[in-house]
Amino acid sequence: KDIDFVFGVGGDDKKNSSSWILTEWKTPKIDRVWGYYRDLHSDGPGVKVKELTVNPNSKLSMQMHDHRSEHWHVSYGTATVNTAIDNPEQYSTIKLTKDNTINIPVGTWHQLCNNTDDELRVVEIQHGENCIEEDIIRHGVDPYYGK
């Protein structure tokens, strides 16, 4: 009748959560130099939904896509977005805060930056003939990435 519990449930002894384990199993993190992303949904080759988490004071490369457009929705933090039509060195910059959105058409140069000391989270909806990671053209050699 004298039973000692060795494993705690919650409280100070809680080491993990089943909801965290389930999230990692369903949508594993894909680590990148700028943070990470999770694939949230894919509806065939033409639609993909991701959540991007950009580390403080980090940025993605200046890039464009031949086969997909993107729609970004800031869910947390402040984003600085650089876009250009023809010449990626002649870009315009806008700031987006929580619940702001931007559409990035096919063939538009774009760069997502987090110039703050807080995490940035963006929901990205890709739409096009083929939403694959290989559909990316980076501008020049980015010293941040070394490629």
What are these regions (language model features)?
Residues 83-109:
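Short acidic-glycine-tyrosine-enriched beta hairpin
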Residues 1-32:
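Classical nucleotidyltransferase
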Residues 59, 71, 78-80, 101, ...:
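Structural motif
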Residues 66-87:
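Glycine- and acidic-residue-biased ligand/ion/polar-headgroup-sensing regions
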Residues 23-62, 93-98, 136-147:
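A short, N-terminal "cap"/entry segment at the start of jelly-roll beta-barrel domains
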